[in-house]
């Protein structure tokens, strides 16, 4: 009943086409002071229109009454104004005591009423088979830019889809469609795109986890930490006073990362790097051993201009940067798993440090364990992810030349999100095996 009219032949959005009139009835409220009571009672008796997107209180259909503030309540279509058998007992009681009258009413709906899903479903034919993709509903949002990844069958409708999406999402000013896979066309993880709606303005600003990020969406990706992008993982961690070394090969991402470190005032805790991920894995382990950093943490004190502090504040604790990393995050699912060989012999070739001395950096000689590796990757979809978990562990084993199974201690494979009808993103977390970390190379 509330669906828009079908428009299968439409290729260019015509907003004026989506109009619909639903014949129904309305309760004319004779006294304005009774509107609230009548609405409550008729809602309880299920006489009002059962649609949360329609305001049931409307100006009276009689123009003279409407000018004087007259209102009516829209009733469900099953209520017929001249057939009392369709009225509920409550509606009859209110009519008999003179509180209201039941009149015919035309409910007019237009483009603004219908949702994105309703409009696109009215235009685009449904999938012919279960194997076909459903009409695209989701999109990635970065600031004012909505990012689509349309399948070929929807290309004839791409501009129409973009126009409707922007109409129904006020924060969206620009809609783009990705033309290739991130990370497959170039080393900087950028992608080709086409603008479907709005200006070609990719300079975005967004806020997440109490942090502000500014970057060019076309030139920099917002992912993290060996592939750190503009810092969406590194900077929130820095806000929590975690020492983070964040690397990205893309110079545009690196520039935005530096800017965002400054904007969010986390320079004491986040160290940016601009190099290849494989080189960063090895070199950062060496550099961190040589690096010394301690950050005093001061208690929060309220200052008054009229009564400035008389003594220099004293830190209540000092945070010291560890000599080894506790976690490595590799969030580039298209290729991150291929960087795992860089961890082979990570601590076997430290200048000035023998393998025996390197082993003493970790348990049982210290409280520090070997680092956890968190690598994102793609796989297929299933209801229980059992086959996918085994497949991912097998690939990790192949990359590290060390057997890894779902039963291995500290191994955890969890699904992050669906990215396509038959494709799912996973994050594989595992502790770097000792035989890998100290293998002679």
UniProtKB/Swiss-Prot annotation:
S-adenosyl-L-methionine binds at residues 221, 248-249, 276-277, 331. Its EC number is 2.1.1.228. One of its GO terms (biological process) is mitochondrial tRNA methylation. It is found in: Mitochondrion matrix; Nucleus; Cytoplasm. GO terms for molecular function: tRNA (guanine(37)-N1)-methyltransferase activity; tRNA methyltransferase activity. The keyword Nucleus applies. Pfam families: TRM5-TYW2_MTfase, TYW2_N_2. It catalyses: guanosine(37) in tRNA + S-adenosyl-L-methionine = N(1)-methylguanosine(37) in tRNA + S-adenosyl-L-homocysteine + H(+). Keywords: Cytoplasm, Methyltransferase, Mitochondrion, Nucleus, S-adenosyl-L-methionine, Transferase, Transit peptide, tRNA processing. Residues 1-9 form a transit peptide. GO terms for cellular component: cytoplasm; mitochondrial matrix; nucleus. It is an enzyme of class 2 (transferase). PANTHER family: TRNA (GUANINE(37)-N1)-METHYLTRANSFERASE, TRNA METHYLTRANSFERASE. Belongs to the class I-like SAM-binding methyltransferase superfamily. TRM5/TYW2 family. Specifically methylates the N1 position of guanosine-37 in various cytoplasmic and mitochondrial tRNAs. Methylation is not dependent on the nature of the nucleoside 5' of the target nucleoside. This is the first step in the biosynthesis of wybutosine (yW), a modified base adjacent to the anticodon of tRNAs and required for accurate decoding. Monomer. This is tRNA (guanine(37)-N(1))-methyltransferase.
